[in-house]
Amino acid sequence: MSAPLSLQTLVKKTVASTSCLSIDEHILKYCDLWWHDAPLKLYMDRGRIQIKSGFLGEDIDLCVALIIAVKENNYNLIKLFTELGANINYSLLSINTKHVRDLCRQLGAKETLEDYDIFCIFNKIMHNKTSGSVILCHEIFINNPNLENKFAAQLRRLIYKRLCGLIEIKETDELSELLVKYWYAKAVQYDYKDAICFLDEKYTDLNEWRLKCYLYYNKIYELHDIYHKEKIQIDVNEMLSLACIRDNNPLTIYYCYALGGNINQAMLTSVQYYNIGNIYFCIDLGGNAFEEGSAIARQKGYNFLSHSLVLNIYSSDASLPLNLKDPEEISSLLKNYKSKNLSIILDYSHNIL
């Protein structure tokens, strides 16, 4: 059972939880309820205390707020957040002075934070799909001397799993570099424009990585801008392969094919990753690497796919123009497009079952 709140903390909690907007700024500052140039507000969300403040303009979990307060050496907020129920052990992730370490010990912090706990914090922050979550993760985790090697190994596995095919991870890679690439990819995936600007300002060597992320996440407008306006380019067949690594990417596949990419190579890449939507879209565009694709599928153990690729039932979709290069025209063309050849194999499968 948690200890009862002190009278002082109870008053602060009451003030911070009120919806009244007329409380004087000086009173809030006196009560340590003014943070990042804005009133600090508390509210409950599914049984957990959330903090509203000026930090990134977003709501944050109480335990995450504690990590930030520790990083800022804000003694009063460390005490307040801990008494309100934040896990004081989370403070170990951002302690940077002896005085704060001593304070956290007095409040009950352990000597070390378990790797599992660090991993949970990382996932807790990234679960909130906002620009602020990316920026917040960067501020807490980048070049953090408190991270243990075991956690670094867990994080490498997570990044490899979530960016499968987009990124190659070697044991010699710097964790900070992998983290930046992971955050940038998530920012592109979910259109976190503020996070992209934040990372672009801090890191000047991400242009090629940005191009690859646009291909991977089917972002045709952004791809067009970076390729034609900013002139950031790589080999068109490499671009097409990147577009095929993640399934259901018709926009960027078509775009790269229209630039001159090899559609048979794209088809084989799609087979390798078992991306069914991409395979049959490549056939719609004229791909005909059936024998080679069947062999790759057989080697991978994709037996039905191997069999289906050598059926003499496919042909390119004559309704698809193959020379569009304007992203708006391509988007309009494919907005409600249903793959001709995917429909053929689905009908075939239905009939034999």
Swiss-Prot record:
InterPro entries: ASFV_MGF360. It holds the Pfam family ASFV_360. It comes from the Viruses. One of its GO terms (biological process) is taxis. Belongs to the asfivirus MGF 360 family. Plays a role in virus cell tropism, and may be required for efficient virus replication in macrophages. This is Protein MGF 360-13L. It comes from African swine fever virus (isolate Tick/Malawi/Lil 20-1/1983) (ASFV).
